[in-house]
């Protein structure tokens, strides 16, 4: 996969302020505030920055955490997991494999079959409904 690289200024011009804060500056939207937290629409969730397909709605589940949760990304290299030691915690950050947008974090407390919970900010996603 070819990497998409832009300067922070280019991203700032392209994204709205909330998208820029979360995707490029590694922010987090408030829990239960995202438009996809309770969405049941079937489709594929794409990266808001580069349109790369990331997650399928068939892997989405209600974790109760306040952010859209998935038990697996799309097959292949849709996302990359990166060690995150910010805020005095040790976590695993999830970024888009194509453009390095911060998406959220992955935790080992999800349902079968993976046991993982990809906790993703809605503002980072664009849902393309299945036809």
Curated annotation (Swiss-Prot):
InterPro entries: Met_Sox_Rdtase_MsrB, Met_Sox_Rdtase_MsrB_dom, Mss4-like_sf. Keywords: Metal-binding, Oxidoreductase, Zinc. Binds 1 zinc ion per subunit. The zinc ion is important for the structural integrity of the protein. GO terms for molecular function: peptide-methionine (R)-S-oxide reductase activity; zinc ion binding. The active site is at 119 (nucleophile). It catalyses: L-methionyl-[protein] + [thioredoxin]-disulfide + H2O = L-methionyl-(R)-S-oxide-[protein] + [thioredoxin]-dithiol. One of its GO terms (cellular component) is cytoplasm. One of its GO terms (biological process) is protein repair. Disulfide bonds: none annotated. It comes from the Bacteria. Pfam families: SelR. Its EC number is 1.8.4.12. Its cofactor is Zn(2+). It is an enzyme of class 1 (oxidoreductase). Residues 8-130 form the MsrB domain. Zn(2+) binds at residues 47, 50, 96, 99. Belongs to the MsrB Met sulfoxide reductase family. This is Peptide methionine sulfoxide reductase MsrB. It comes from Pseudomonas savastanoi pv. phaseolicola (strain 1448A / Race 6). The gene is msrB.
């Amino acid at each position: 996969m070819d990497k998409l690289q832009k300067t922070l200024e280019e991203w700032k011009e392209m994204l709205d302020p909330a998208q820029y804060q979360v995707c490029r500056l590694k922010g987090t939207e408030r829990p239960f505030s995202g438009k996809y937290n309770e969405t049941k629409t079937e489709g594929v969730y794409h990266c808001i920055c580069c349109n790369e397909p990331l997650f399928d709605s068939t892997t989405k589940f209600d974790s109760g955490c306040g952010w859209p949760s998935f038990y697996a990304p799309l097959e292949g290299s849709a996302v990359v997991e990166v060690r995150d030691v910010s805020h005095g915690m040790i976590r695993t950050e999830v970024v888009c494999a194509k453009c390095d947008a911060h998406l959220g974090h992955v935790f080992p407390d999800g349902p079968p079959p993976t046991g993982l919970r990809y906790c993703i900010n809605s503002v980072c996603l664009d849902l393309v409904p299945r036809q």
